[in-house]
Amino acid sequence: MTKTSPAAWTVAEVEADKGWIYPLSESEGAELIAAVRAAAKKAGPVDRPILDWKRDDFALEKALPTLAAAFREVRDGRAMALVKNLPREGVTPMEFRLMTWAIGLHFGVARPQNRTSDYITEVKDVGMAYRSPTGRGYNSKAELDFHVDGSDVVLLSCYNQAPVGGMSMCSSAATAFDVVKAERPDYAEALTTDYTFSRNGEQSEGEEPWYAAPVCTTREGRVFCKWNRNRIQNAQKIEGVPQLTGLQREAVEYFDTVLRRPENMFCMHLEPGDLQILCNQTMLHSRTSFEDHAEDEKKRTLYRLWLARPDSRRLPDSWAVFYGTSEAGTVRGGMKGHQYDDVRRNFDARQAQAMGMKAA
């Protein structure tokens, strides 16, 4: 089978070549936490409203080349990168959260992620039911389906890991779609037809509760994938939504099976101080269920950031219904939710200008 892109990798390939891992040096890590603490001292406190912070509040220089290389890997390479050695020892949760935000301010425009229009979310179990019509996996400890998030890239920084489970799983949609085309071309064709996705009650004013898009689309030789079983299943329960055909159902089941084949599904435990960066157009991700610590301060905790990137590629036209536009290098994607207000609009405009991007 001919490889269609660097993102079409197998587990054996990413295990043999660890060029997608980017360790920060001691001085680079020290600069990150020093920048956060200096900003908090000058313009703090550290827990001030997150959208009040500006890129220029965080003086970064040494760490930027390593971080930039990781983002290039996500765009032009294997569609995933792991940055290691973010400062963790002696760093408070709020400092770690702000450090994640500071990195985002230097590399894109953060996007809202949920019905409450949050721009950075704490990934922590609060007892939410993942399979409910409004369930979100990041607030549960359940095993998650493979999926992509609603932005150009997603950043996950690890503050605490679970004592048991919670393993991160990544699988290349480019690889899986190549396999499906070779093994079942009828399923591959079905994956390029429209499926319906529920917005899980997070739609903003003027948006429908569901939208339609193909699971797989090829544009300029690249595979773009939207796959989220939970949202497809929830959409089927909404009145007036077109029902999937038998072939469409079989196709996504087969596609998901291919994603989970041992040769395609790469597993890693995110450790405290790790920053995982994934391309949401090509790289599907998931997580195993986990058992947590009893003490709240030890519980599995990550911080999730969705970014629109200044060097983003043009999207397939069918993606514009969710992203707002398919135009490259624009502030696009995210879920505006129910609390998208002037504060958020002003942040988007200010950060877009700082990054030289066109605001939506």
Feature map (PLM): residue ranges:
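A short alpha->loop->secondary-structure connector
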Residues: 100-110
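Active-site environment of non-heme Fe oxygenases that use a 2-His-1-carboxylate facial triad
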Residues: 1-63, 68-69, 76, 81, ...
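"Short basic amphipathic alpha-helical interaction patches in structured regions
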Residues: 94-101, 170-172
